[in-house]
């Protein structure tokens, strides 16, 4: 079942070029507003898309739930403009498509600054609910590099311990590192105690990482690999979100090395173009340990996310 006319399977180069016009057509400020951040998850989240009234519409629902939990992303523009009447017609047509598929309509993971755009187009129609678990953490690149200030003192101590204790080599990831990278990823996963939902999410993440490795040479994709004694022990992969912001999609490190997480984060930031000033390190998904780790790095701000359901 697909809610919209097209899926993310068998996408042509023309399709990707069209999508990029929309993903790059407005500063959405969310980590999911790139082609790759959707494409690499297509095996876990069944994605469908269609251009309606000039806006790019996309639905996403877990494949193992038969898309019954599907939501619609905010309609995307390629010219930086949102016309209230066209946007209203777009959403109304999309609601009809959800209804025809037997799926309750909702707009999900809506960046906070875009809620007003939808409400202006359709006043009184939707109820907006803040979803804390989906809020994204945005950091200053220079702070992640320097770890300066009292609030980051413990992180800086961990980094300094690593630098005093170990010799390492940092270099961009390449496809021929795939075997070592996947072995490290699987090894880290084995040591975690997780509930069944987390296990499923990590299985999906593993598949997404495999997909991402095929795109390391794509423009605006950035990566770093950390080698200790010739062995790959940490890596990070991300991409550009906007002129001054990048998103880090994946970060893995062997926890046996104190300070390695701080190091790989620093090296990833140092590998970014100079004009990148902000790093979106995505959401914590409501996982307590992940939330604690992200909060401990003292984000510059949170990119809030909302769920919008029709009233009544």
Question: Which residues are covered by each model-predicted region?
Answer:
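Acyltransferase donor/substrate-recognition loop-hinge adjacent to the catalytic core
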Residues: 123-200
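Short catalytic-loop micro-motif centered on adjacent basic/acidic residues
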Residues: 106, 171, 278-281
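Conserved active-site alpha-helix within GNAT-family acetyltransferase domains
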Residues: 114-128, 157, 286-302
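A basic- and aromatic-enriched beta-loop-alpha substructure that forms the phosphate/nucleotide-
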Residues: 93-119, 124-140, 144-145
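Aromatic (often tryptophan-rich) hydrophobic motifs at membrane interfaces
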Residues: 221-311
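Short, conserved active-site entrance elements at the starts or edges of catalytic domains
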Residues: 176, 180-231
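Conserved donor-binding loop and adjoining core beta-sheet/short helix segment
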Residues: 34-113, 227-257
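Amide-forming acyltransferase catalytic core, primarily the GNAT-like/NAT-type
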Residues: 2-55
